[in-house]
Amino acid sequence: MASHYEMFPAVVTRVEQLTPLIKRFTFKRQDGQNFPRFSGGSHIIVKMNEQLSNAYSLMSCTQDLSTYQVCVRKDVEGKGGSVFMHDQCNEGCEIQISEPKNLFPLAETGNKHILIAGGIGITPFLPQMDELAARGAEYELHYAYRSPEHAALLDELTQKHAGHVFSYVDSEGSMLNLDELISSQPKGTHVYVCGPKPMIDAVIDCCNKHRYRDEYIHWEQFASTVPEDGEAFTVVLAKSNQEIEVQSNQTILQAIETLNIDVECLCREGVCGTCETAILEGEAEHFDQYLSDAEKASQKSMMICVSRAKGKKLVLDL
């Protein structure tokens, strides 16, 4: 069932340049009220205008709800949202902020928690580390980045979590040895990873190699994982009695929008769940991060902003 988000008019109260490519944005509600409560790992949808909206991990303190904070890495080859945030979203800018949702929560139990971050993937771990510290849990952050000038938030983290933070700098030849890290953990350790897809894949593969159960491996990635060389296919819209060809370089959502059919989709990254659509016939190749593995295997619904057809035809409840 499609997810729906309550939206709050907000204003940007502070913009900080943390690295050459990363800015931190602080938001307040326009009505002066507190934002909803959230837990570490939660994301929000930032709606910049009618065309642009992106999902970002909340990185602010879970106890201070007067503001929300996110970090945005500028990606000139992306959909345009990060460029808008960097180039046009200044202090005083009015935008829409969604209520938080958490698809990347901390496990409630576990002997130890290993957090692995690459680049901008550090953001969800800030509130999570605070939560783990408050629990008195055993935890470590392993943070890899390209060069010292790209080490967003490292000083803040090492000050708050001394002895729990380990950093790896590509430009200095300091590499994270995943096999050594994963294999040396006690039984019952949870592993979390957020960062570029190659890092996520490597962590998952390493955990599988050392026989970690699926429920002990947690990952989050907002960048799209849709292959660029997909095949064209046909989509039949059962309710509107229309048929459309989805080209290899199109998403189903983009194709449907050419018919002027309105489908709600906030993130366009397979994260928020707002475009979830029932599958009446055919099978989907799932690329979203919203549905569970079991839900994907059931082939009952799909996220039309990123997922595609396995075969030549899909019939959707639209």
Curated annotation (Swiss-Prot):
Keywords in alphabetical order: 2Fe-2S, Flavoprotein, FMN, Iron, Iron-sulfur, Metal-binding, NAD, NADP, Oxidoreductase
Top-level taxon of origin: Bacteria
Residue intervals of the 2Fe-2S ferredoxin-type domain: 233-318
Function: Converts carnitine to trimethylamine and malic semialdehyde.
Gene that encodes the chain: cntB
Record bears the keyword NADP: yes
Binding-site list for [2Fe-2S] cluster: 267, 272, 275, 305
InterPro entries: 2Fe-2S_ferredoxin-like_sf, 2Fe-2S_ferredoxin-type, 2Fe2S_fd_BS, Benzoxazolinone_Detox_Enz, Beta-grasp_dom_sf, Carnitine_monoox_B, Cbr1-like_FAD-bd_dom, DmmA-like_N
Species name: Acinetobacter baumannii (strain ATCC 19606 / DSM 30007 / JCM 6841 / CCUG 19606 / CIP 70.34 / NBRC 109757 / NCIMB 12457 / NCTC 12156 / 81)
UniProt keyword Transmembrane helix, yes or no: no
Cofactor(s) needed for function: FMN; [2Fe-2S] cluster
Protein name, UniProt field: Carnitine monooxygenase reductase subunit
